[in-house]
Amino acid sequence: MALFLRRLRDLREDNDLSQADVASILGISQTVYSRYERGYQTIPLEHLLTLSKQYKVSLDYITEDVTKNENGRRH
């Protein structure tokens, strides 16, 4: 999960966007987006799809850490 959260933050920062900018793109508050990045709230698939398009990366790239179990194999 840590890689997933770090990747969300890194993608945002690599695109020179603030949390408020991304929240606006997603139609949510900055507080909610901050909770996504810190792992306090589950990010909906719809928002992940929007972010993958915004950042021009695959959904798999964003969620890679989440889709592996502790043995490193995909679910």
Each language-model region and where it sits:
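DNA major-groove recognition helix of helix-turn-helix/homeodomain DNA-binding modules
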Residues: E46-Y61
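Conserved hydrophobic/aromatic packing and binding residues within compact polymer-binding modules
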Residues: L8, V22-A23, Y33-Y36, I62
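Short basic helix-loop element that most often maps to the first helix and adjoining turn
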Residues: R6-D21, I25, T50
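Recognition helix of helix-turn-helix/homeodomain-like DNA-binding domains
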Residues: L26-T42
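Short, charged recognition helix plus adjacent turn
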Residues: K53, T63-H75
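Short, basic-rich loop-to-helix N-cap that marks the start of a DNA-contacting helix
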Residues: Y40-T50, N71
